[in-house]
Amino acid sequence: MEALPNKENQCVVNTDTFVSMTDEISSVMESIPASYSKTICEHMKRLGCTIEDLSFESGLTIRTINRHRSSETLKPSLASVVALCIGLKLHPIFSFDLIAKAGHRMSSSREDTAYSMVLMTMVNMDIVEINKYLIAVGVKTL
């Protein structure tokens, strides 16, 4: 995102950047599968992410990731879905899509609010730092 200073020395975001991002995100959203497990596989493929990379970035075991990737009947915990989103460094739009496909709906609870904060503002942070934040706000770690 390109921010340009205006004459009052305030940063103004270039609208063209948002148009481009909207086009890109919309294109991906139209092409990803309807199922939870297939959506994970598609994001991994699209991002060039291996299972080993995802395990390292998310803190989830390879076995757990494989279950998420292969089971259409899995009822994953919200924490594990959020961990996958963090591991894949998904844009919040993709994260909330994956959460919905996993059968979850974010509420106004403290836990869901903390997870939403993570997905919207901390997605590029290390999982260890994210877990420190979650501990600080009294929420289950990823």
Show where each model-derived region lies.
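Key DNA-contact positions within bacterial/archaeal DNA-binding proteins
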Residues: E52, R63, I93
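A short, Lys/Arg-rich alpha-helix, primarily the initiator
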Residues: T17-D53, I127-L142
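Alpha-helical residues within the helix-turn-helix
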Residues: K45, F56, I86
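Long, compositionally biased
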Residues: I86-L88, D112-L142
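Recognition helix of helix-turn-helix/homeodomain-like DNA-binding domains
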Residues: G59-P76, K101
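Short, charged recognition helix plus adjacent turn
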Residues: M1-V13, F96-M125
